[in-house]
């Protein structure tokens, strides 16, 4: 398998459905699978998955494992070359994964990749741009400098 898309879900049935529809379109033509760990949702997520997304590998936990442990569980069941961790409120453009994989293939020094996030109106989400976490950057954020100069290259 070339790519596994890992999604952790808890009480977000409708958002997850939209996310999965976009991921299924984005992986068309890619040797990929989708793994969803549901953290014991009671909102009908498991039934929705079985009805609308039967090809998605569903790991229905009987307890809320938490975000990190649920991601680790999915990764332990993947044998893919690449792993994409995706939040269930994400909608992917159709060509997004093809382009990302091409970049990864072109440069074997790349070990991980982030993305530029935009909201539903097309506006850039600054939380998708993070500087390297250093003590100095933590201090800038703590005392408010990052709010005074939000476009500074340090953060």
Describe every region a protein language model picked out:
Residues 91-127:
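Conserved donor NDP-sugar-binding/catalytic core segment of glycosyltransferases
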Residues 17, 43-51:
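Acidic helix N-cap motif at the loop->helix transition within catalytic regions
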Residues 1-25:
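N-proximal low-complexity "stem/linker" segments adjacent to membrane-targeting elements
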Residues 31-40, 59-61:
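Short beta-strand/loop segment that forms part of the nucleotide-sugar
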Residues 22, 38-46, 63:
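A conserved acidic beta->alpha catalytic loop
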Residues 60-78:
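Glycine-rich, basic loop-to-helix element that forms the pyrophosphate-binding segment
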Residues 132-155:
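Short, flexible, basic/aromatic active-site loop/helix in glycosyltransferases
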Residues 83:
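Short aromatic/hydrophobic "clamp" motif used to bind/position activated sugar donors
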């Amino acid at each position: 398998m070339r790519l596994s898309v890992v999604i952790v879900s808890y009480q977000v049935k409708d958002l997850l459905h939209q996310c999965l529809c976009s991921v299924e379109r984005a992986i068309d033509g890619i040797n990929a699978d989708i793994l969803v760990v549901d953290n014991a949702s009671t909102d009908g997520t498991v039934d929705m998955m079985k009805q609308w997304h039967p090809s998605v590998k569903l790991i229905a936990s009987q307890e809320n494992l938490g975000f990190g442990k649920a991601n680790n569980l999915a990764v332990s069941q993947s044998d893919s070359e690449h792993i994409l961790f995706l939040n269930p409120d994400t909608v992917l453009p159709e060509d997004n994964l093809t382009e990302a994989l091409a970049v990864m293939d072109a440069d074997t020094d790349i070990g991980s990749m982030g993305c530029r996030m935009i909201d539903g109106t097309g506006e850039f989400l600054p939380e998708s741009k993070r500087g390297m976490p250093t003590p100095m950057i933590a201090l800038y954020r703590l005392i408010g400098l990052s709010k005074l100069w939000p476009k500074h290259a340090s953060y």
